[in-house]
Amino acid sequence: MAVSPKINRREHILQCLAQMLETSPGQRITTAKLASEVGVSEAALYRHFPSKARMFEGLIEFIEESLLSRINIIMNDEKDTMRRCQLVLQLLLIFAERNPGISRVLNGDALLGENERLRSRISTLFAKIETQLKQILREKTLREGKGFNLDEAILANLLLAFAEGRIAQFVRSEFKLKPTQHFDEQWRFIQHQLLQS
């Protein structure tokens, strides 16, 4: 029974951190400010997380679990190449839009001046997503016998760059320019171009 409050406190700390990232765009979050927001001492924060880097790692774990598990569901449920790509991009954009503070972590903005391994971990996450997109595009050739005129790795990079750009605009606009704004029209254009290649 004593474990449950500890887990809830950890979750509460991470929720407060994400909220502060949202309400304080461009500002660095200190443990003193976070402790004040949570309503505990800095020492109490460190009882749950040995360092601020571990707090950010907690957010990154949430991001990884949320995105990668949903991408696996898309891969299992959907077989159409273009629909899979659309759903993966849409997932990234909706996730960022629903979690503005966490979008600063995805974008790297919140990690400036923090431990290098945090930025490396986000880079690894995006590399995994790009690999998934590449796999989706390559499977088109296997299933349909017809691929693309451009290498699938180049196309996967282009698709991911589109999503990353939309997330960057969201962060830069202080969460005013929604990542999903005009997505349907943009996707129709992108899909048309992909199918032409």
From Swiss-Prot:
<dbReference type="InterPro" id="IPR050624">
    <property type="entry name" value="HTH-type_Tx_Regulator"/>
</dbReference>
<dbReference type="GO" id="GO:0010974">
    <property type="term" value="P:negative regulation of division septum assembly"/>
</dbReference>
<comment type="function">
    <text>Required for nucleoid occlusion (NO) phenomenon, which prevents Z-ring formation and cell division over the nucleoid. Acts as a DNA-associated cell division inhibitor that binds simultaneously chromosomal DNA and FtsZ, and disrupts the assembly of FtsZ polymers. SlmA-DNA-binding sequences (SBS) are dispersed on non-Ter regions of the chromosome, preventing FtsZ polymerization at these regions.</text>
</comment>
<keyword id="KW-0238">DNA-binding</keyword>
<comment type="subunit">
    <text>Homodimer. Interacts with FtsZ.</text>
</comment>
<dbReference type="InterPro" id="IPR009057">
    <property type="entry name" value="Homeodomain-like_sf"/>
</dbReference>
<keyword id="KW-0131">Cell cycle</keyword>
<dbReference type="GO" id="GO:0051301">
    <property type="term" value="P:cell division"/>
</dbReference>
<dbReference type="GO" id="GO:0043590">
    <property type="term" value="C:bacterial nucleoid"/>
</dbReference>
<dbReference type="Pfam" id="PF22276">
    <property type="entry name" value="SlmA-like_C"/>
</dbReference>
<feature type="domain" description="HTH tetR-type">
    <location>
        <begin position="7"/>
        <end position="67"/>
    </location>
</feature>
<dbReference type="Pfam" id="PF00440">
    <property type="entry name" value="TetR_N"/>
</dbReference>
<dbReference type="GO" id="GO:0043565">
    <property type="term" value="F:sequence-specific DNA binding"/>
</dbReference>
<dbReference type="InterPro" id="IPR023769">
    <property type="entry name" value="NO_SlmA"/>
</dbReference>
<protein>
    <recommendedName>
        <fullName>Nucleoid occlusion factor SlmA</fullName>
    </recommendedName>
</protein>
<comment type="similarity">
    <text>Belongs to the nucleoid occlusion factor SlmA family.</text>
</comment>
<feature type="DNA-binding region" description="H-T-H motif">
    <location>
        <begin position="30"/>
        <end position="49"/>
    </location>
</feature>
<keyword id="KW-0963">Cytoplasm</keyword>
<keyword id="KW-0132">Cell division</keyword>
<dbReference type="InterPro" id="IPR054580">
    <property type="entry name" value="SlmA-like_C"/>
</dbReference>
<dbReference type="InterPro" id="IPR001647">
    <property type="entry name" value="HTH_TetR"/>
</dbReference>
<dbReference type="GO" id="GO:0005737">
    <property type="term" value="C:cytoplasm"/>
</dbReference>
